[in-house]
Swiss-Prot record:
Protein role: Encapsidates the negative strand viral RNA, protecting it from nucleases. The encapsidated genomic RNA is termed the ribonucleoprotein (RNP) and serves as template for transcription and replication. The RNP needs to be localized in the host nucleus to start an infectious cycle, but is too large to diffuse through the nuclear pore complex. NP comprises at least 2 nuclear localization signals that are responsible for the active RNP import into the nucleus through cellular importin alpha/beta pathway.
InterPro entries, A to Z: Flu_NP
GO molecular function: RNA binding; structural molecule activity
The protein's assembly and partners: Homomultimerizes to form the nucleocapsid. May bind host exportin-1/XPO1. Binds to viral genomic RNA. Protein-RNA contacts are mediated by a combination of electrostatic interactions between positively charged residues and the phosphate backbone and planar interactions between aromatic side chains and bases.
Protein name according to UniProt: Nucleoprotein
Key words, A-Z: Capsid protein, Helical capsid protein, Host nucleus, Host-virus interaction, Ribonucleoprotein, RNA-binding, Viral nucleoprotein, Viral penetration into host nucleus, Virion, Virus entry into host cell
PTM note: Late in virus-infected cells, may be cleaved from a 56-kDa protein to a 53-kDa protein by a cellular caspase. This cleavage might be a marker for the onset of apoptosis in infected cells or have a specific function in virus host interaction.
Gene: NP
Organism: Influenza A virus (strain A/Swine/29/1937 H1N1)
Residue window of motif Unconventional nuclear localization signal: 1-18
Length: 498
């Protein structure tokens, strides 16, 4: 982006810091990661988890959820004011899985939130370390993005399920801050805005009074975040219109849906970060790795390196394929749910298959599932190459796309053609070009129609050998363009339910 000079890098957002140089950023991200690792080790000690149990991704997720719950101020306050039967607002917990006599057993644990906050602060040198909490939220969000489809949520807001590639970060909590906003897809922002406008249509007091003023500020801030994701002047001008509307209503919803569709070809800038489960950081800290001294980056080689030599396990249901479970977690670790499968396959060095062909359900185990038949296996999270994560949508280019997902949102800065079928996308634009945004709409449609096949994204960017940590000799992969590129193609994934 041209305005890069005024922007904080997303590592700075992640660590809440002001402008820093590269070394300082690496150190502060390292401090955040080290804090998560130390917290995890301490929790394993408290819960008396064996080494093997501490490497179980389901245990990691329970511990992560407990710390997020302990610091969820608004929900904690709500729980204290609206006591519900059988819920102690001061406690948090979840399932912990232990290996007993060659079988996996589930144990539901409860902990004082105060105690967890104390352990977290102690692991983070007495600081609140909100950046680490956000990092955990983004890992959970990336896992949801790879596991579930959001068809229902898309349809409910009047959008099209084929726009799923725009939905990154759709399950992130509101409190995820600037780092959270950076990883949200265009569709996610549009959906949040549409929900807000619909509330305003149904509730006449929504925009009024002192509360309404705060709502209005939030609305304009969300509009600005979305505007910042667009890379063309016409899309941004249209966002200004939506933001400045005196009384947002159906016209604004129409404009937002139009903009979301346009982002399938004129892609927005969406950040990607490799956020790993807490147990991976814990393992590294336990083996003596000093993240703050070594420095760490979420968008470079570091997460790949970490995954090359971490052994993480997962519970496996009777008819699940462990290799497929590994793919799911690998995609989540690298925020690659909406990446072109050909690019992911090349980097991973193993074929990455579409969601509909995976014989695996989500990573988390429901409380009513039978533990008797549960097995566990090692997750294969290693990669053949590494690539720099991107924060831009790249330029665009035509390619055959599918009935399910009709576009991708690149994760890795790797030179390639970006697949979408112009006819499919353009068919979505029949009709409405009147109203006060007509000239912008016309301009956006013109740009979409003239997107040329020879515009490849990320000119000259490639992947790197894992021994090439300074990214000196890029390998530009060649892709078989006849293969299917979309992950959610012909999909049968479960819906995401809170």
């Amino acid at each position: 982006m041209a305005s890069q000079g005024t922007k904080r890098s997303y590592e700075q957002m992640e660590t809440g810091g002001e402008r820093q140089n590269a070394t300082e950023i690496r150190a502060s991200v390292g401090r955040m990661i080290g804090g998560i690792g130390r917290f995890y080790i301490q929790m394993c000690t408290e819960l008396k988890l064996s080494d093997y149990e501490g490497r179980l991704i389901q245990n990691s997720i329970t511990i992560e959820r407990m710390v997020l719950s302990a610091f969820d101020e608004r929900r904690n306050k709500y729980l204290e004011e609206h006591p519900s039967a059988g819920k102690d607002p001061k406690k948090t917990g979840g399932p912990i899985y232990r290996r007993i006599d060659g079988k996996w057993m589930r144990e539901l644990i409860l902990y004082d939130k105060e105690e967890i906050r104390r352990i977290w602060r102690q692991a983070n040198n007495g600081e609140y370390a909100t950046a680490g909490l956000t990092h955990i939220m983004i890992w959970h969000s990336n896992l949801n993005d790879a596991t579930y489809q959001r068809t229902r949520a898309l349809v409910r807001t009047g959008m099209d399920p084929r726009m799923c590639s725009l939905m990154q970060g759709s399950t992130l909590p509101r409190r995820s801050g600037a780092a959270g906003a950076a990883v949200k897809g265009v569709g996610t922002m549009v959906m949040e805005l549409i929900r807000m406008i619909k509330r305003g249509i149904n509730d006449r007091n929504f925009w009024r009074g002192e509360n309404g003023r705060r709502t209005r500020i939030a609305y304009e801030r969300m509009c600005n975040i979305l505007k910042g994701k667009f890379q063309t002047a016409a899309q941004r001008a249209m966002m200004d219109q939506v933001r400045e509307s005196r009384n947002p209503g159906n016209a604004e919803i129409e404009d937002l849906i139009f903009l979301a569709r346009s982002a399938l070809i004129l892609r927005g800038s969406v950040a990607h970060k490799s956020c790993l489960p807490a147990c991976v950081y814990g393992l590294a800290v336990a083996s003596g790795h000093d993240f703050e001294r070594e420095g760490y980056s979420l968008v470079g080689i570091d997460p790949f390196r970490l995954l090359q030599n971490s052994q993480v396990f997962s519970l496996i249901r009777p008819n699940e394929n462990p290799a497929h479970k590994s793919q799911l977690v690998w995609m989540a670790c690298h925020s690659a749910a909406f990446e072109d499968l050909r690019v992911s396959s090349f980097i991973r060095g193993k074929r990455v298959v579409p969601r509909g062909q995976l014989s695996t359900r989500g990573v988390q185990i429901a409380s009513n599932e039978n533990m008797e038949t549960m097995d566990s296996s090692t997750l294969e999270l290693r990669s053949r190459y590494w690539a720099i994560r991107t924060r831009s949508g790249g330029n665009t280019n035509q390619q055959r796309a599918s009935a399910g997902q009709i576009s991708v949102q690149p994760t890795f800065s790797v030179q390639r053609n970006l697949p979408f079928e112009r006819a499919t996308v353009m068919a979505a634009f029949i009709g409405n070009t009147e109203g006060r945004t007509s000239d912008m709409r016309t301009e956006i449609i013109r740009m979409m129609e003239s997107a040329r096949p020879e515009d490849v994204s990320f000119q000259g960017r490639g992947v790197f050998e894992l021994s090439d940590e300074k990214a000196t000799s890029p390998i530009v992969p060649s892709f078989d363009m006849s293969n299917e590129g979309s992950y959610f193609f012909g999909d049968n994934a479960e819906e995401y339910d809170n």
